[in-house]
A protein has these predicted regions:
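Single conserved hydrophobic/aromatic residue that forms the stacking wall/gate
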Residues: 1-13
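Structural motif
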Residues: 10, 46-48, 68
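Conserved short histidine dyad/triad with adjacent acidic residue
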Residues: 18-36
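Short beta-strand His + acidic residue motifs that chelate non-heme Fe in jelly-roll/DSBH
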Residues: 29-31, 49-50, 71-74, 80-87
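Glycine- and acidic-residue-biased ligand/ion/polar-headgroup-sensing regions
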Residues: 35-52
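Short acidic-glycine-tyrosine-enriched beta hairpin
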Residues: 54-76
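Double-stranded beta-helix
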Residues: 56-58, 83-114
Length: 114
């Protein structure tokens, strides 16, 4: 019984984590969420994470690197992206969301940051 409970918890946690690999110069994201929030943690490479509240023009820029691990919080109502700043190296990012992706209610809306 305890084992089944642990497996259920692990499944829930695993569904909310993803590892994303971006080629040099690639921008990913350009979307926002109504309720979902996320953490982006670059574990290898260098990136620019940008966020903008959807009702403003002010862009928040976070330069991050796998050399100094830190989490950047993506808030609901903020369009966001992540840009691989390298010309030669892949960017590896660990992403966590507070809720698992639901294809029937994706809560993901395209909107460029800039």
């Amino acid at each position: 019984e305890m084992s089944a409970s642990l497996v259920g918890s692990e499944m829930c946690i695993r569904d909310r984590f993803s590892v994303n690999i971006s080629k040099p110069g690639v921008t990913k994201g350009q979307h926002w969420h109504h309720t979902k929030w996320e953490f982006f943690i670059v574990v290898s490479g260098k990136a620019l994470i940008q966020q903008r509240r959807i009702d403003t023009d002010e862009v928040l820029n976070f330069e991050v690197s796998g050399d100094k691990i830190e989490a950047v919080h993506m808030l609901p109502g903020y369009t966001h992206n992540i840009i691989n700043l390298s010309d030669t190296c892949d960017l590896v990012t660990l992403m966590w969301a507070n809720e698992a992706f639901d294809p029937n209610c994706p809560d993901t809306y395209f909107l460029p940051v800039e």
